[in-house]
């Protein structure tokens, strides 16, 4: 089956939804065992991770949402609460990959009594500096006013730069992402991508004081050849979270190892979940 066919199959088998403030939030629940709430990256559709999510579900209950074009972090928090309530989950591991890692750091500020461990994969500290706001505002303006075909093409290029898969599979992944961008995502989704990050800065959500009452563990999964990783990320995480951070080195698997080598990726995740 093609990637898109496998995504559709995954969605049909495990897809569920909740309606929160007149917005439909689709999500997926699969597996048995201790729950992990997994927040996907900037592709905005958890089904892109069908292979690793099904593998992870062999020993864990996995819950992973899609992202509608919400414009604020509060909307995400409210929806995530509704999803977990619908599934009867009170205590859980919280994970996020890339863009989802930033959302995970936000959600943890709201769930310090419920999250036993935070797993951050191929992402960075979410306390973005105020100096990032002008650039984010430029991206938001471009997303709102450029022709939709143009902004979708630019967003596709941005996402493809981070997709690390074997060369033989790259054309199929490009087709899947192009199809998603043209047929599923809207201009509002692209605005949301940047607006939520700007909202995070404006409201000063991610900061050391927000984690003072959290008693859980923090684990970072990082690849040496991931362009989003920085040498100072671990010290910044430790300063932000107020505790030592366990690092799981994924070698040279790149930014999207969940796509390129899902079984190996789950091995690393299992280390973080022990």
Name each region found by the language model:
Residues 54, 63-99:
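Active-site loop/oxyanion-hole signature of alpha/beta-hydrolase fold enzymes
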Residues 253-262:
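Catalytic histidine-centered segment of alpha/beta-hydrolase-like enzymes
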Residues 93, 116-119:
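Residue in the alpha/beta-hydrolase core beta-strand immediately N-terminal to the catalytic nucleophile
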Residues 20-71:
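Conserved HGGG/HGGXW glycine-rich cap/lid loop of the alpha/beta-hydrolase fold
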């Amino acid at each position: 089956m093609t990637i898109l066919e496998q995504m559709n199959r995954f969605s049909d088998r495990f897809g569920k939804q909740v309606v929160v403030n007149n917005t439909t939030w689709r999500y997926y629940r699969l597996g048995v065992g201790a729950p992990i709430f997994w927040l996907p990256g900037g592709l905005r559709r958890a089904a892109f991770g069908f292979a690793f999510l099904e593998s992870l579900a062999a020993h864990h209950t996995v819950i992973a949402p899609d992202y509608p074009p919400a414009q604020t972090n509060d909307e995400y928090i409210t929806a995530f609460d509704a999803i977990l309530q619908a599934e009867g989950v009170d205590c859980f591991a919280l994970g996020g990959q890339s863009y989802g890692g930033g959302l995970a750091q936000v959600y943890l500020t709201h769930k310090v009594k419920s999250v036993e461990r935070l797993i951050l994969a191929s992402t960075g500290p979410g306390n973005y500096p105020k100096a990032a706001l002008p650039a984010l505002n430029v991206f938001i303006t471009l997303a709102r006013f450029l022709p939709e075909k143009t902004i979708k093409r630019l967003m596709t290029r941005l996402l493809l730069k981070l997709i690390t898969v074997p060369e033989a599979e790259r054309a199929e992944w490009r087709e899947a992402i192009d199809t998603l961008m043209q047929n599923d995502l809207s201009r509002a989704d692209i605005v949301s991508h940047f607006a939520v990050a700007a909202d995070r800065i404006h409201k000063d959500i991610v900061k050391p004081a927000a984690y003072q009452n959290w008693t859980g563990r923090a684990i970072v999964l990082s690849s040496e050849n991931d362009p989003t990783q920085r040498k100072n990320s671990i010290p910044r995480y430790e300063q932000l979270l107020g505790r030592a951070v366990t690092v799981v080195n994924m070698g040279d698997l790149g930014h999207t190892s969940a796509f390129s080598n899902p079984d190996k990726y789950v091995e690393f995740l299992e280390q973080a979940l022990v």
